[in-house]
Swiss-Prot record:
Residue ranges of coiled coil: none
Lineage: Bacteria, Pseudomonadati, Pseudomonadota, Alphaproteobacteria, Hyphomicrobiales
Protein name: Glucans biosynthesis glucosyltransferase H
Membrane topology designation: Multi-pass membrane protein
Organism, as annotated: Rhodopseudomonas palustris (strain ATCC BAA-98 / CGA009)
EC category name: transferase
Pfam families to which the protein is assigned, alphabetical: Glyco_trans_2_3
Family: Belongs to the glycosyltransferase 2 family. OpgH subfamily.
InterPro entries: Glucans_biosynth_gluTrFase_H (IPR023725), Glyco_trans_2-like (IPR001173), Glycosyltr_2/OpgH_subfam (IPR050321), Nucleotide-diphossugar_trans (IPR029044)
Length: 721
């Protein structure tokens, strides 16, 4: 069993007794699901069938028109091998753009008509009553503990203000491997648990299956006591209003297994993060409304800020281990898509609620941090290729897998398309053409394209990319209240222009990063599990130059290649080349943090900040003492209550199995036995030995009882004794 801590209403000093009354064990079986056999499930009638026909027909017609025009561009004089490659790549990329455009157009239309969702969630009016038991689950991995707990506590206070707080229990499920983070989490927990009940903290000594395993462990141990669970990320904040409304919707719709809210990016401090924040705020609702409208009861799950029916999840979403070696085999990384697909396969409806406000998240502060997270997502999404043939999946669930895979494969396809285009031009410029083939022909073969039609194809493609932005802008401008929340019409229009320009500069760089990620995965390189970097995004100049050297070199090569052919080709490729050549200065500019109020790209949450976000800052400051020690051993040695809390939690660890030796713990025991003082022993222990000691009650007590100078006391601590 893992270390689990739970508060009682007694005095917070009674740590040993307080740790005993855990939430009553309510085991809930979560069997691993088979991908080879389809379970018997009740039929789900979706009103979205005709909507999907409309979307697919419109996408097919638009794609056919674009592909036909591109064929007409290339077929002048016959299609060569390189031109055939360009046509195939264009067909795939244009169909991708067409589907995105049609879906966004659907979102624009339904929002103009007042559509909200298919589960009847009211976004205003009085709050409904809730009678179900709801668990708020916050999985965390080596995050900034005071900020993580502050976000959770702000969410809790918002729920309590609705008068429905008694229905909610709160769990922090830690997979942290950093000893300092582990002890800091316990310190923050103790601070909040002293005055708040129904708050629980559990640390897993082994983070098996990462986040999905963390959630599954909770379901199997405590899930039977709860009707619903809300999954949060370490950067999630949700208002009580949105939580009560989605919980009531789950009660009303007994066949709904999951409702995904639309998280809005907040707290952006760098220019890069502000671009993502503004884009998500202004374009996100329209795009989400479009996908929710035609996905219907086969919508997707994004892994956080969603409410899930616990019994449905336990009975249908147990993840199998994929056959083969990493990166394609092993544990399923992008588990959210798969869990939603398995729940839908079992007959549960999956919905997206795109119009609910009050669901928030944060964004990586720089493109490098975004790309690091994207690398893990890329591997997880490509892994879904093994799941496309799973038995019994709904075709829309398979489409989710395909679009997730396509989100990353389109990057190397775009790069290949650009390179093939340059090669065609170089071939026409420098390679002597074979005007007369070896076989008999009355007419020569002229290598040529139609430049006028090519310009129209380019303009049409750009139109499909830009028009959704203009439609979203139109939705803001036509509503006076929405327009004011974005700072006015002129500032909103200027924000769209600035966002479009910066996105155009960073898109080619992201293309290179994603292409590199795909190649690495195909070569068998695993992404691992890195800590998500949050904060101000500051990156040393040397690191920026090193990481952006490849995009810059590629841009230089493309520019030289285009210049060797002709100035028109160079001008044609300017949007891509400029972004690559300016990769380093743009990176330095967009990672610079600013506390000042921006003139453009303002969002409603910046102009009129929700109270819950201000509470996060205040709570984080309260939970982070100025002279707090970062040494976990010193923290335990200098604070009796924290030490007793930690030791009480370790009482729930399973006993060591005979014959199984932890080499780091064994090394630590030898070093501790050989040391003449606490300071000497602590100085000899490395990070892995410290973590092993923190997880073993007997060894930790032996270390802390050694004589030696005490660690500096933390604020509010008591002398050891």
């Amino acid at each position: 069993m893992d270390a689990v801590i739970a508060p009682r209403h007694e005095d917070c000093r009674d740590v040993e007794r307080r740790a005993e009354p855990l939430p009553a064990n309510a085991p809930l079986p979560m069997p691993v699901q088979s991908l080879l056999q389809s379970p018997r499930a009740a039929a789900v009638r979706s009103p979205a069938a005709w909507r999907r026909v409309l979307i697919m027909v419109a996408t097919a017609v638009l794609s056919a028109a674009g592909i036909y025009e591109m064929y007409q561009v290339l077929q002048v004089g016959g299609i060569t091998v390189l031109e055939g490659v360009v046509l195939v790549l264009f067909a795939a990329l244009f169909a991708w753009v067409a589907l995105s455009f049609v879906s966004a157009l659907a979102g624009f239309t339904v929002l103009c008509c007042g559509w909200r969702d298919d589960v009847g969630i009211s976004t205003d009016g009085s709050l409904p009553s809730v009678s179900s038991r709801i668990a708020m689950l916050l999985p965390t991995y080596n995050e900034d503990a005071p900020v993580v707990f502050a976000r959770l506590q702000a969410t809790r206070q918002s729920v309590d203000e609705t008068g429905r707080g008694a229905q909610f229990d709160w769990f922090v499920l830690s997979d942290s491997t950093d000893p300092s983070v582990w002890i800091d989490e316990e310190r923050c927990y103790a601070e909040l648990a002293a005055t708040h009940d129904r708050l629980y903290y559990r640390h897993r000594p082994h983070n098996t299956a990462r986040k999905s395993g963390n959630i599954a462990d909770w379901v199997e141990r405590f899930g039977g006591a709860y009707d619903f669970m809300v999954i949060l990320d370490a950067d999630s904040v949700m208002t009580g209003d949105v939580l009560v409304r989605v919980a009531a919707a789950m009660e009303t719709n007994s066949d709904v297994g999951l409702i995904q809210t639309l998280p809005v990016v907040v707290q952006a401090r760098t220019l890069f993060a502000r671009v993502q924040q503004f884009a998500g705020s202004i374009y996100g609702p329209m795009i989400a409304a479009g996908t929710a409208w035609w996905h219907g009861s086969e919508s997707n799950y994004w892994g956080h800020n969603a409410i899930i029916r616990v019994s449905a999840f336990a009975g249908s979403a147990g993840l199998p281990t994929l056959a083969g070696r990493k990166p394609f085999g092993g544990e399923i990384l992008s588990h959210d898509f798969v869990e939603a697909a398995l729940m839908r396969r079992a007959g549960w409806r999956i919905h997206l609620a795109p119009t609910l406000r009050g669901s928030y998240e944060e964004c990586p502060p720089s493109l490098l941090d975004f790309a690091a997270r994207d690398r893990r997502w890329c591997q997880g999404n490509l892994q879904h290729g093994k799941l496309l043939t799973a038995r019994g999946l709904h075709w829309v669930s398979r489409l989710h897998f395909l679009t997730g895979i396509g989100a990353y494969l389109t990057a190397p396809m775009w790069l290949a398309f650009l390179i093939a285009g340059i090669l065609i031009s170089l071939q026409a410029q420098f390679v002597r053409p074979e005007y007369f083939p070896k076989d008999f022909s009355l007419f020569p073969i002229w290598p040529a394209q139609d430049p006028v039609r090519a310009a129209w194809v380019f303009a049409g493609t750009m139109g499909l990319l830009i028009l959704p932005k203009l439609l979203a802008l139109f939705l803001v401008l036509i509503r006076s209240d929405t327009r004011r929340r974005f700072g006015g019409g002129l500032r909103t229009f200027g924000g769209v222009l600035l966002e479009t320009m910066i996105s155009a500069l960073t898109a080619p760089v992201m293309m290179v990063f994603q292409s590199t990620a795909v190649i690495e995965i195909l070569l068998g390189r695993d992404a691992g599990w890195q800590v998500q970097h949050r904060g101000d995004g500051a990156i040393p100049l040397r690191e920026v130059v090193r990481r952006y050297a490849l995009p810059t070199a590629l841009g230089t090569t493309m520019a030289i290649g285009a210049w060797l052919v002709s100035w028109p080709l160079l001008l044609w490729m300017t949007p891509v080349i400029v972004g690559l050549l300016l990769a380093i200065p743009v990176a330095l500019l967009t990672t610079r943090a600013s506390r000042s109020r921006p003139l453009l790209m303002m969002t409603p949450e910046q102009i009129d900040p929700p109270a819950i976000l201000a509470q996060v800052h205040a709570l984080a400051d309260r939970l982070c003492p100025a002279n707090q020690t970062t040494d976990p051993l010193s923290a335990l040695r200098g604070d009796r209550r924290l030490r007793e809390l930690h030791l009480a939690a370790l009482a729930f660890h399973p006993p060591r199995r005979r014959g199984r030796i932890d080499p780091h713990l064994a090394t630590a025991r030898v070093l501790i036995d050989d040391a003449e003082s606490y300071s000497e022993a602590a100085g000899w222990l490395g990070p892995r030995e410290i973590r092993a000691v923190l997880g073993d009650r007997e060894t930790l007590q032996r270390l802390l009882q050694l004589s030696g100078e005490h660690a500096q006391l933390a604020v509010g601590s008591e002398p050891s004794g």
